[in-house]
């Protein structure tokens, strides 16, 4: 049995000893059945939140309104959630009310897909009322109950369906795909932040190409930031070898290279990306657009290591030769890597000239920077002083 389950077993045992039902549920059970890596577990119980808190010495109300209490056991923290049913979904994401219940099957009934609606008890016996194991055997993503109802409850489940297809290399069953296509406009009610998380998970999957093909088939791109009417660009994007990807930034660089938005900055901001990512991708864009392989000294210097590494990564994804080692060597051989590396400063110029500060200081430093980069002069203080025409003291 997986160590993650064994470590969390005392939580289940404490709950069952107190007379309640308790199970491992959701993604951890699914991944166990698929022999995938399990990082953490979700625990569901018939004990109500106040009852859970009485059983464990240390607990925190992390999601008490939805029945979730975080408990500490053997210096580890576990989320324990009470079985529940949910009322109507008024915003296509959150239920209007949550009711705590004692029935496992009723709790599993509200979950998204049958493969995620399997529970495992403390003896590692499975409870599978919706035939999730069969779906896993058939490599099928099938909604619990009516797919249209599940998607209406939380529109993000449509994006999750496509993401699971990519991660697991599964297929959607016919009813689930039909509901996905007919209700795709509901995705507009989902926050961009949640969509971005699912997009990245999808792109990191082993079947990203098939996932994008399905995404286009159901017209999901219409509701993704900046991708409306970009079917041909996304088809090109999907054709690249994304299994060679090593960074998240390459996904975004690839997307802007394929789409070629008028305003790269605005396009990336629409996905609510961190400023650091936006700046890096924006800087790399023009170089990547030309699939740059050979770099001039000045280009290498102004681009910097992060940019040329990212451009090279996308080149590899697009089928070009990996030039990282060669370009890195050329970069390391540069006499300076930024203006800060110059052997002189503005203070030196003021001292040597006896003049007041002004625009000329920056202009002179720019001139020295170019001279050093072109190997016209060595980056040594005395040589630079002579080169600028200042006499020795």
Swiss-Prot record:
Nucleotide-binding recorded as keyword: yes
Reactions the enzyme catalyzes: a tRNA precursor + 2 CTP + ATP = a tRNA with a 3' CCA end + 3 diphosphate; a tRNA with a 3' CCA end + 2 CTP + ATP = a tRNA with a 3' CCACCA end + 3 diphosphate
Family matches, as InterPro entries: Bact_CCA-adding_enz_type3_sf, CCA-adding_enz_C, CCA-adding_enz_firmicutes, NT_sf, PolA_pol_head_dom, PolyA_RNA-bd
Uppermost EC category: transferase
One GO term of the biological process aspect: tRNA 3'-terminal CCA addition
PANTHER family on file: CCA TRNA NUCLEOTIDYLTRANSFERASE 1, MITOCHONDRIAL
The organism's place on the tree of life at top rank: Bacteria
Chain sites annotated for binding CTP: 27, 30, 111, 154, 157, 160, 163
Binding of Mg(2+), residues: 40, 42
Organism: Listeria monocytogenes serotype 4b (strain CLIP80459)
Residues the entry annotates as binding ATP: 27, 30, 111, 154, 157, 160, 163
Keyword Metal-binding in annotation: yes
Described function: Catalyzes the addition and repair of the essential 3'-terminal CCA sequence in tRNAs without using a nucleic acid template. Adds these three nucleotides in the order of C, C, and A to the tRNA nucleotide-73, using CTP and ATP as substrates and producing inorganic pyrophosphate. tRNA 3'-terminal CCA addition is required both for tRNA processing and repair. Also involved in tRNA surveillance by mediating tandem CCA addition to generate a CCACCA at the 3' terminus of unstable tRNAs. While stable tRNAs receive only 3'-terminal CCA, unstable tRNAs are marked with CCACCA and rapidly degraded.
Subunit structure of this chain's protein: Homodimer.
Family to which the UniProt record says this protein belongs: Belongs to the tRNA nucleotidyltransferase/poly(A) polymerase family. Bacterial CCA-adding enzyme type 3 subfamily.
Cited Pfam families: PolyA_pol (PF01743), PolyA_pol_RNAbd (PF12627), tRNA_NucTran2_2 (PF13735)
Keywords of this entry: ATP-binding, Magnesium, Metal-binding, Nucleotide-binding, Nucleotidyltransferase, RNA repair, RNA-binding, Transferase, tRNA processing
Cofactors that this protein relies on: Mg(2+)
GO molecular-function terms, A-Z: ATP binding; CCA tRNA nucleotidyltransferase activity; magnesium ion binding; tRNA binding
EC annotation from Swiss-Prot or TrEMBL: 2.7.7.72
Protein name (record): CCA-adding enzyme
Further remarks about this protein from its record: A single active site specifically recognizes both ATP and CTP and is responsible for their addition.
